[in-house]
Amino acid sequence: MDTKRLILFVIFSFSILMLWDSWQRDQQPPAASQTQTTAQSVEDGSVPQAAKSSASAANQASVPAETGFRLQSAERINVETDLYKASIDTIGGDLRRLELREHKDDEDQTKNFVLMDDQSAPMLYVAQTGLIGNGLPTHKEVFTSESTNYQLAPGEDKLDVRLTWKGDNGVEVHKIYTFRRDSYAIEVSYEIRNNSDTAVDPSVYYQIVHDNQSHQGSYMMPTFTGGAYYTEADKYKKLSFSDMAKTNLSKNASDGWVGLVQHYFVSAWIPEDGLVREFYTKKLSDNVYSIGSVSPLGNIAPGQSVTLKSRLYAGPQTQSELKSVAPGLEYTVDYGWLTVIATPLFWILSSIQKVVHNWGVAIILLTILIKLVFYPLSAASYRSMANMRELAPRLQRLKEQYGDDRQKLHQAMMEMYKTEKINPMGGCLPILVQIPVFIALYWVLLGSVEMRHAPFMLWIQDLSAVDPYYVLPILMGITMIIQTKLNPKPADPIQAKVMTIMPIVFSVFFFFFPAGLVLYWLVNNILSIAQQWYINRSTERAAAKKKGNARR
């Protein structure tokens, strides 16, 4: 196989892997139309139907499905903890705005990252809960609170925000948000006191409303923004907004969670253990969707009280924390079909970071470690290329000898390879084996929130973003040129031009890659150059020694 075919084979194989990886991953949904200017201008039909727990509940009239979606607003309750700045509306006790104090905005890092907001610019994203049946409060009813400002005091480990609703029939409902220090898991409780003369048989629902907008950027490939749920039976499932638009989800389960996933962050409702639940999705208007869970609570007799607890995880996709919150929540960190490779890579990378306390240095050390693991394969590849380099003059003479008779030329080349014990594919296959590791590391550096705004040194202050001055891509291009010089020079002028242009093309590609990935590739190239130079020198010495012995 000649140099041209080798180049085409490598490029084609790499392209197929990248395209397959891209196809396997859910694509980012198209931007929704900007017809609405504020969340309040949209119509509302967001109350789910009641769950059916018994024959009596089956006869109970569910809340009728309304058309459209309207998000109304009343008094706001402001909450501040070590991790959050939150805003709760007294209508429904909805969580209307949520800022993450430990994570900063992409455009202005003096501002907190806004995970949830009830405005449609840049996006509508709220968490709602409610009770259905017997006139109990849905997320449209007005609650009261003793205060409009709550703050987690120094030395305190938790903060309770209590909202109260009292019905005309005597039923009293308390909705309590419990924020805990150093935790992104918010406890949301209902205390239902039936002070009426008749039994009530309600259902409880938890849902997230989103308008299919996303301000999360990505590099070269889109990242997923959409719904997700997990059960022990079905495991982790994702639901794109286009899927929600086509059909409503209705999935019964006895465990699991439901939520919304976006680049680096996730919000998930985790109902109380043992509570039978139905996961659902609903298209509320042209671009507004809800995804949630509804559960029957059973009969609550007069004079009886019931307490129900659930959790809302709303925060970064920090893998160590996700595993401890709920089973399957760690799957929201999506590394695609190469998760089996990416997961241990991230574990090694994070273990190194805990020692060196710098993600950039950790990437460099991981690169060295990967290079050591693949050293035998790389050495075989470079040794094959070095041998091909030594044969280049003889190959040129064969081409001149046989001219356009490609069949005889091919036979002569194969005979020469056999005599010299050289595999022309020897320089290609070891490289192909390493490509899945490269792709897996790409998704680790792109999809891990730990990389977001992680500084390295000097001008690299965000390893998840592109190099602002393109220094790393340019340096990487220079190393590729050096590698090209170390490889066998193609006899065909067209092939030589291709080899000259490739470093420029790859450098342009890497202009749009995260700086952390370019750093990995740059360090890998530098190590490869050192290894290839050493092997070339060794091969040249061996060839010279062989010629000297032949003269004797």
From Swiss-Prot:
Q: Which GO terms describe its cellular component?
A: plasma membrane
* Molecular-function GO term, any one: membrane insertase activity
Q: Which UniProt keywords apply?
A: Cell inner membrane, Cell membrane, Chaperone, Membrane, Protein transport, Transmembrane, Transmembrane helix, Transport
Compartment(s) of residence = Cell inner membrane
- Single GO biological process annotation from the record: protein insertion into membrane
Q: What does this protein do?
A: Required for the insertion and/or proper folding and/or complex formation of integral membrane proteins into the membrane. Involved in integration of membrane proteins that insert both dependently and independently of the Sec translocase complex, as well as at least some lipoproteins. Aids folding of multispanning membrane proteins.
Quaternary structure (record): Interacts with the Sec translocase complex via SecD. Specifically interacts with transmembrane segments of nascent integral membrane proteins during membrane integration.
| Record protein name field | Membrane protein insertase YidC
- What organism is recorded for this protein? Methylobacillus flagellatus (strain ATCC 51484 / DSM 6875 / VKM B-1610 / KT)
Q: What taxonomic ancestry is recorded?
A: Bacteria, Pseudomonadati, Pseudomonadota, Betaproteobacteria, Nitrosomonadales
